[in-house]
Amino acid sequence: MNTMTTGLDALLITAPNDLQPIGEKILARQRITREEGIQLFEKGTLPYLGALANHVRESLHGHRTYFNRNFHIEPTNVCVFTCQFCSYSRLYAHRDEGWELTQRQMLDIVRSYDGKPVTEVHIVGGVHPKMNLEFFTELLQKIKAHRPGLHIKGFTAVELDYMFRKAKLTVEEGMKKLHAAGLDSMPGGGAEIFHPDVRNIICADKVDAEGWLKIHEAAHREGMHTNATMLYGHIETYAHRIDHMDRLRELQDRTGGFNTFIPLKFRNKDNDMSHVPESSIIEDMKLYAVARLYMDNFPHLKAYWPMLGRQNAQLSLSFGVNDLDGTIDDTTKIYSMAGSEEQTPSLSTAQLVTLIRQAGREPVERDTLYNEIRNYKDVDPDGTDLDGIPTDASLN
């Protein structure tokens, strides 16, 4: 038995009696139940949960921590929906307060990365009543014509549900159309919290849990991988969190199409839930740990560093997380407008490598599908190999 397992065994002995069998199941790689997941939230101490989650993380990935070189395009923040937690959107009647990018403007953004080693463009925005399925299929085709090798990850299930209904297409028909036009994968946004007791309060007018899951299942059946998210730290309970993760786990059992699970921290700046306090860093780390323990069929757990902040993202790497997203290059406003830690989110490759190394982990650049592009483990830390910047570059 290795030292890590021996240490975990010692920790199990000191855990509350009703948590010891759960820890033993996890070490034996057995699936935990809904009730056991709730118990971990309610009774698990941070050291206990962190040690178990880190054990699972290192069993899957060792010290490897992934990132990619990406940029975002947000076509618009004009939206037909009025989610209570959203600080980003503007109604169509007030579109003069927001932005609406044309196809030409979005292609100009893509062209601005010509010659740069980005591998992914992430396209997501508000649900604009005038930006329909044809508009976006044309955009996808033009991006692929300009840069065929660029992976396009685009559109939340909320956006797609609206597009498909307006086009009078089934989910399967709409997904085939987008895939043929150049869509390669989907992000996980719009999931929020699945349980209707919460969803009917915070985002009652957009696609429900069943619709969200149906769209992702259709994408998986079409041969595309997707991500999954959960918005946490507002009015939901531990039981609501486990219900959400359980529905995702069930779909993953059927399709295997999810790449990664991404918990998203609720931020209370400039929205209709500003009276709701934000979760503590202790609660954040507990959430990451339980997610890693419960989502046993998800290969990856991602912390979105602009939302958490750089130091907290480093900390999450000891609580089950093995992915920190990408360079982003200050191309997203969705979370900065809600008061995220990073108001101008951009890190060079060198800075991301440094951030990961400072946490005692091994930086690995990946593509969207987690194919390894480069392992930075053995790069000379005093060199100027990364973007022409020393690998110990300041994170400030």
Task: Specify the residue positions occupied by each region the protein language model found.
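N-terminal pre-triad scaffold of radical SAM enzymes
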Residues: 48-92, 98-124, 186
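Hydrophobic faces of well-ordered beta-strands that scaffold small-molecule active sites
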Residues: 65-73, 121, 152-156, 186-188, ...
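Catalytic cores of alpha/beta
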Residues: 170-174, 235-249, 308-319
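Conserved SAM/AdoMet-binding glycine-rich loop
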Residues: 117-216, 220-228, 234-235, 300
